[in-house]
Each structure stands twice: as C-alpha cells, then as structure tokens.
C-alpha cells in the first residue's frame, strides 16, 4: 500500500509534469480543454501505474483466493447499488457537517480549480473530459485498490466489519482533504458493504461512479 501511494505521488507530482515540461507544455498556460486533457492523462497514468504495482506485488500469491477482483454482470448487485444511492443525501449531510467542524485554515486564498473554471466557462469538451476522469477513471482504479485489494487483504487480520471500516478510512485519508474525511469514510463503508454483499467489484465501481457523477452535476448548478 505504501509503495502504491509513493507511486501515485511520484507519477502525478513529478513524472507527468516533467514529461509535459519536456514536451514544451506548461499546465498553467493551458486552455480549459488542455488542462482537462492533462488531468485525464495524469489520472490514466496514475491508475495504470498503480495497477501495475498491484500486479507485480501479487504475482507470488497467484492463483489469488476466490473473491479477489471479482467482476460479474449477473446477480442482484443492482439492488445493492440502488440502496447505496439512497444514502447519498446522508453523505452530503456529513460533508456539510465536516466543513463546519473543519473550516479552511487561514492563509492565502486558494484559487478556483480548473474543473470549476471549465464549468464557469461552460466549455463542453473540457467538462466532458473531466466527467470521464471522475465517473470512469477514478472509480475504476480506486475501487481496484481499496475494495479489490485492500479490503480482502485486511480480512486476513481482522473481522470483515473492521476491514470495511479500515479500508474506508484509508480511502478517505488518500484524498488528503480534512474537510472531506467524514463523508468519504462513510461513503467508503457503504461501498465496502456493497462489495462485501455482492462479492462483485463492479457494484462498488458503479456506485462510486454514480456518487462522483452526483457531485459533478451538483457543481454544474
């Protein structure tokens, strides 16, 4: 897990920016569409690097035990996803509570994010690229890491409920945002529960995608 975090940081903070600079691009001077494409390529690179690390580290444990990285279109996992969606308002409520408990630290005013700038500018191409990042890329690789790998790994050392909670806490902390810890922990528990019930990683991916889409659409209001 530490190796994955280090790889994620190295790729996103150093390798991709270095390659972009070597190619003659500067993120600060890119257009809305350029920044959106940059974010998409960065996310894809981080995801592929993380999956490659997992593939390499799990090589000596193959064949993997049943239940690891299970994908299945069949079954009643749609009902589990639907139930998870019903909890979205509670996640939203926890987000507001968390923000009230952890106000922004004093210091320089943080600028508007590139996502918000694209939404304000109503650039359809940039918004579509960001939509792919948050509803496709992020759910796939985050669920592979936290529900596909970490949660089953933790069940070797603790009961399933504690494994779900621990993987949810790791999921929240990996976002490096104190103002979002409470909703992300709860969301991680919900997605972990959906995965545990359905034994299907596709279920938690779809739920994750729907939540991210819900947040993205809320930003567009």
List each language-model region with its residue ranges.
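Hydrophobic alpha-helical transmembrane segments
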Residues: 2, 40-41, 78-85, 128-132, ...
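Hydrophobic alpha-helical transmembrane bundles that constitute the permease/transmembrane domains
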Residues: 10, 43-48, 141, 161, ...
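Alpha-helical membrane-inserting segments
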Residues: 11-24, 49-57, 90, 94-98, ...
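Juxtamembrane helix-loop-helix connectors linking adjacent transmembrane helices
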Residues: 17-44, 58-138, 156
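Hydrophobic core segments of transmembrane alpha-helices in multi-pass, intramembrane catalytic enzymes
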Residues: 46-50, 130-133, 184-191
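Short juxtamembrane and helix-loop transition motifs at transmembrane-helix boundaries
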Residues: 141-150, 166-173
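Solvent-exposed interhelical
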Residues: 152-164
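Functionally important transmembrane alpha-helices
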Residues: 161-221
